[in-house]
Amino acid sequence: MGKAIVLDTSALIMGYETTEVEAEHYTVPSVREEIHRDDIRKLRLDNAINSGHITVRSPDPKYRGETQRVIGEMGEADALSEADAELLALGAQLKGEGWETTVVSDDYSVQNVASELGLGFKGLATQGIKRQFRWETYCPGCRRTFEDPQEDGVCPICGTDLKRRPSRKRPLRT
């Protein structure tokens, strides 16, 4: 196919110009909802959508499920919003449809998961990640680690606030 660029809220807030890049541009409904809280940016986004420069598209459930699985395996579930997960799922779907897909986001967790999904990524205000991380949740009090994030962020054993740390670092997938 061609090139597809998936835009995160941060890209739209930073003023990413869709007319400067030869590619199809996409975003997801939840990003559009986040932008609609700001009048000026809402107007710019609506103009880009109405003029055909940006397409708003929801990912298929198959890609949502696969992306949620990867997010969980990487320990990024607490760091990513529903909009982030939806955006990454759309990127995975576009890649599956044959597009050369790049996610534009300054969020390091989005970039981390995009790398694992085999998507390109680019930041506007940041250089982007240099290595890929898998995260684990741990208790600094009793030193236990947890596979799944605890809902309240508190250790069920000793009551200490839980923290995240990298459990594995590796070079980026290319």
Stretches with model-predicted labels:
Residues 2-95, 99-100, 108, 116, ...:
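Active-site-proximal, substrate-binding regions of enzyme catalytic domains
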Residues 24-31, 119-131:
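Short hydrophobic/aromatic-enriched beta-strand-loop microsegments
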Residues 101-103, 121:
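Hydrophobic beta-strand scaffold residues
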Residues 132-135, 151:
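Short metal-coordination and nucleic-acid-contact micro-motifs, chiefly zinc-binding Cys/His arrays
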Residues 138-142, 155-158:
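Short cysteine-rich clusters marking metal-coordination/redox-active sites
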Residues 147-154:
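Short linker/helix segments within small regulatory modules
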Residues 158-167:
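Short Cys/His-rich micro-motifs in 6-15 aa windows
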Residues 166-174:
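Long, charge-rich boundary regions
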